[in-house]
Amino acid sequence: MLAWWMLLPTLLAMLVALVLPGFMWLRAGVRSSLVAIGAAPAFTFGLITALSVLYPALDIPWEPSTVMPVLGMSAVGGAAAWALSYFRRVNGGFALNGVPFREAIGVRVPIGGRQAAIRTATWGTIVVGFLLAAWPLMSVADPANPVQQWDPTFHQNGVHAILYGKDASPFGGLHELYGGRRVYYPTGWHAFVALFARFDSVVQTANVSSLVLMAVWVTGLAALVSVLTGSRTALLAAPIIGGMLPNMPADALTMYNQWPNSTGTALVPGVAAVAIVVGRRLAADLSDGCGARSFARRIPQGLFLLLGCLGLVGAHPSAAFSLLAFLAAPLLMVIGFFTRTSLAREGRGQLAALPWIGAGLAVVVLPLIALSSPKIQAMGRYPRRGSSWSEAFSHALLPYPPFAQTTAMAWWTLIQVLLLIAGIIVTARLHTLMRRPGVRDAADARCDLDGDEDEAAALVDNDKAAPMPAWPLVSYLILAFLTALAYAPDSALRTYLLAPWYKDGRRIMGVEDIALTVLMAVGAAAIVHLFHAAWTSSLRRILVERGLDDNVEAPRWPLQVGVGAIVVLMSSFGAIDARNSAVASVYDPTRLGKSGMASEDELAMLRRMASTTDSDALILGDPIAGAAYVETLAGRKAVFPQLSTVNADGASQKVLTQRFRDIADDPEVCEVVRNLGITHFYEEEDGSYYNIQRSNRHPGLYGVDTSRGFELVDEGGTAKLWKITACGWVTPGGGAQAFADGIRSVQPGAEEPEGPQSGDE
């Protein structure tokens, strides 16, 4: 735990860098600080994505000294825009008309004690939600240990490559991981983390980024719920429920740890909140007959939204499809409303329906065209098989990751089911079916389950609070269908629709958690509302019996605290034992799961390589046996820096992975060793990785006779590091240049690796 406290400055710096550049720009147009903070990280990732593409074209290196000033200028520009917006709103324009400036802007009225309490409670629950999400990682994992899982190894080495190459472009910035082959890969997360990492702190900084994304996630969920309902209880419940969910953030940011994909998922709620606010204002302007002016008035917020969407794509393209899957229902509903309104007019007024019909077709057709693109369909060809319809149904409505099935997990699942059912009943207005015709509570009609719509709305905006819409239920069903399809038997539809997520159910389930959180938060508010109504009724009955004034209402906060405490305690803090076990399976080298690659002693040997080998050493070893960690833990170049062997020099790669064990008898092996400058061999005993034997993938790296032609340098656990002497003198092929450009021939006059290519991981 102390090691995490030492990284607190990095955590705070990351949060400030994510929030400030975009917060004030959005705050100038949206009066809710919560929504502005929830959406600001997407704006920052949009800036980072744009800069990562622009800088290589201008030959500007990617480093803090060149990027941070731009983010700082964005924050300053946003502050100026906010100040001008506030002045114009308060003064009724920019002209002073002889009035002193201080008098023109007026004196800001301090918020009242009740509103201060509401804000404190809101941010308090966000902090609680963050702590519930982060506690397993902080209590179980050592931040200096790498995540022993397939994708995180690639991503950590990707950050390391950017530090050396000073190139964060998605169009080849990670070429070092492909042996010099330039391919497209979204680098938003890598580029951001590289701004805070040093060569020897990549692992720690990457792990801290998980905490940052957890904070972004719970804040974004609170912002999203705040714009969907005026219920204060739902707003308070959302970050707590969202922080304890097993898919996102527990699985996505610990056990599975798909950092780029998880970044995109964490950004979606905040962007969705802004999209809803902008959409409502645009719809209101159009309903008021503002016409084209409606769109002109929303240009600033629209630009922010576009940059936020760019941030989603920069983090991972699947996030854009996730946002569309979540917001497709309200988009089509609004378009349908204006289409019907236009058709109801007489004469030429009906022609106004044509643009709306076109917009509706665009919402449906354009994503289908994007799904058909070669890049996206290449992702769909990833070899991930489906399962069965029973498996599909079991994951669809309440998704769950492959965590330990503990008693606490069973209780937490049951509580989620109850909250979800309550949320569905309220969102679908099913509770109104039991009432007599004409009898309907106004607060419930607005889905203001707490009855304090004005104060709740003040947290969101000064605009009139909107009723709780039914479309989140439709979004939930859409995402549940996609999750079910991921676990369903193989089909062309599965490959086509799920390509952006590599047909991976665990990626889609994190997105489904957004809709689940909304529904469960509303369900929690409904339960509190029922208890509060019963308590108030009982209290009034007692007062009537005593002849006292019964115009009173029971306090709501004891019920909010009580129901929240029951949910947290009965679920054992969101099945924290199962979440702890999940963290340990990839972080604790003494308790590794089937994705584990390096024991505690082996990690110690890897760290000693910084002193047992020269800085220009080039290490050959099976990447899925721990050799891929030599870059981030030892600062030494690996022949295969990711768990897939996809170097540009395919011929040399094949010789090494298939025939290196014949080094004493096969002269071609030594030719490759000398040509690439391989100085050391990382030996590990054969074993299983998931359900395959490592030697089946790379047989040439096992069964090597090290009794001659090798000198033992170090050992740790079952792993050994050997210096290769079988090929005579070898010019080392590692060092800073190899990190920047990828490994290449060190022999004079040798051919350069093949030119730039594009491909998919």
Residue ranges and their predicted role:
Residues 125-266, 286-292, 584-596:
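Active-site lumenal/periplasmic loops and adjacent helix-entry segments of GT-C-fold
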Residues 13-16, 569-761:
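Extracytoplasmic
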Residues 288-317:
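Membrane-interface alpha helices of multi-pass inner-membrane proteins
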Residues 171, 177-185, 347-434:
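Periplasmic/ER-lumenal interhelical loops and adjacent helix-loop junctions
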Residues 1-114, 447:
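Membrane-embedded, hydrophobic transmembrane alpha-helices
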Residues 58-67, 143-148, 249-263, 382-404, ...:
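Membrane-helix boundary/interfacial segments in multi-pass membrane proteins
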Residues 288, 323-359:
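Perimembrane helix-loop-helix junctions
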Residues 413-473:
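Hydrophobic, aromatic-rich transmembrane alpha-helices
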